[in-house]
């Protein structure tokens, strides 16, 4: 049998734990994983890929954008990061030397995760033909803001054979407003007909 003083101690501990839990929840709301917190947000802040970032910046400055890009390389070298920076810069309303301004509505909506013009698909977990068909449906929609709808497909080598074939038709005849940026660690797993339609970095 618990004594009254023991019950009071238990209640005090529970109250303290509740306050600590509340505090922890408030702290966690503002918590950002280091990889995201320190992920480069401009071409200038990308380390070790100057030859690629300068080429992409030149394409934006000159308005010479391809309809499909493939970024290849080992994990952690910045493929997806460069794809996101490029996607943002493509639709920036006031680009400066190929860099996104980070101030226009298009840049702000991208930075806040509410851009309607940039679509990301993680093919590691969304690799079926239905996932690609859903993406193809989005490709048909004209961009609401900016000139292009940009589709970033990460780990593209993970797509099923049927998904690759479904995607190929769109890649062969893309609408003028669509740009695809594919990223992979295993280029050799991508079918040659896809490779032949991409600028490869």
Please place each PLM-identified region on the residue numbering.
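Short hydrophobic transmembrane-like helices used for membrane targeting/insertion
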Residues: 1, 10-11, 27
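Cationic, amphipathic, low-complexity segments that mediate targeting or membrane/lipid association
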Residues: 5-8, 12-15
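P-loop/Walker A NTP-binding region and its immediately flanking N-terminal helices
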Residues: 6-7, 19-201
